[in-house]
């Protein structure tokens, strides 16, 4: 609802009071949770939901809850739940989550199997940088007023309204730029995903293009394989839109008539990432 408070962990090093967590099995083990207003939010919230795309063992979640309870004892008085798209948590770890007072819900529950062993025979490779070639027109189409930052915490109603307003303004300008009935890629950058999804959803609803697809760059290194039975068949290695020397990836690209990057990275169009992305889309 509009009164729901939302904050997500981040791997960005930002100013303020942050709680550091470790996700041992992750490609980027350290992530942070903004604590600037967390004590007040816990006091105001009768229930707290931890959301992830996938829970594999549940250990990271249990460790996070234990760490938060040590710092915020009132968390022990709150209802806790975990929600995910996928869950492959074993029955033993499901019992540990229940003992920790965490109710779990998922959309798809996978059998607890050794998935790593199941893919050992598949010849995968890491994504490579795109080949260099002629670049299409690169420019900043629209700079919105700064949106509320979910890394530091937002009220859901305010955040979704701001994202919707920015998307409407952006698409009103985009109508003059796109070929009729073309294919549009809307691309988020790393943790800046929801604004891109909002733009893509609105573009689809209004019939701006014949097809609209939404991607996001990611720090996750995933093996690619052209086999038709394998889900990730192509990918490119890109420098981060946020600068520095970290690697990011973009998977399963298709052919598009136009690509719209929705990002909170400063001066993104002037960086190497944008030119490399344009090269990848031109391949």
Where on the chain are the PLM-derived regions?
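Intrinsically disordered, low-complexity linker/loop segments enriched in Gly/Pro
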Residues: 43-71
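A generic short-segment signal for beta-strand/edge and adjacent turn/coil regions
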Residues: 15-20, 50-54, 73-76
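Short, glycine/charge-rich flexible loops or terminal/linker lids adjacent to PRPP-binding catalytic cores
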Residues: 3-48, 62, 217-256
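Glycine-rich, histidine-containing beta strand-loop boundary motifs that form or position
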Residues: 8-11, 58, 84, 108
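PRPP-dependent phosphoribosyltransferase catalytic core
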Residues: 66-182, 193-283
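Hydrophobic, well-ordered secondary-structure segments
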Residues: 1-2, 6, 49-50, 83-89
């Amino acid at each position: 609802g509009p009164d729901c408070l939302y904050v997500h962990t981040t791997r960005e090093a930002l100013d303020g009071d942050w709680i550091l967590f470790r996700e041992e099995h992750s490609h980027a083990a350290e992530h942070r949770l903004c604590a600037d207003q967390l004590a007040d939010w816990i006091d105001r919230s009768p229930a707290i939901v931890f959301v992830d795309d996938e829970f594999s063992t549940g250990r990271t979640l249990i460790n996070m809850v234990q760490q938060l309870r040590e710092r915020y004892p009132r968390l022990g008085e709150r209802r806790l739940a975990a929600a995910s798209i996928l869950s492959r948590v074993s029955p033993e770890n499901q019992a540990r989550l229940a003992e920790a007072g965490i109710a779990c819900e998922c959309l798809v529950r996978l059998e607890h199997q050794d998935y790593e062993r199941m893919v050992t025979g598949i010849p995968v490779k890491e994504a490579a940088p795109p080949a260099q070639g002629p670049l299409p027109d690169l420019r900043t189409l629209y700079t919105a007023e700064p949106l509320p930052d979910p890394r530091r915490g937002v009220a859901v109603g305010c955040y979704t309204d701001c994202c919707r307003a920015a998307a409407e303004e952006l698409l009103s300008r985009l109508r003059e730029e796109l070929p009729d009935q073309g294919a549009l890629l809307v691309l988020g950058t790393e943790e800046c995903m929801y604004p891109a999804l909002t733009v893509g959803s609105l573009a689809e609803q209004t019939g701006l293009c014949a097809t609209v697809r939404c991607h996001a760059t990611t720090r996750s290194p995933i093996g690619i394989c052209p086999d038709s039975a394998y889900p990730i068949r192509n990918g490119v290695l890109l420098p981060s839109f946020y600068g520095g020397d970290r690697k990011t990836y973009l998977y399963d690209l298709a052919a598009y008539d136009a690509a719209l990057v929705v990002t909170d990275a400063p001066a993104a169009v002037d960086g190497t990432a944008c030119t490399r992305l344009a090269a990848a889309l031109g391949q």
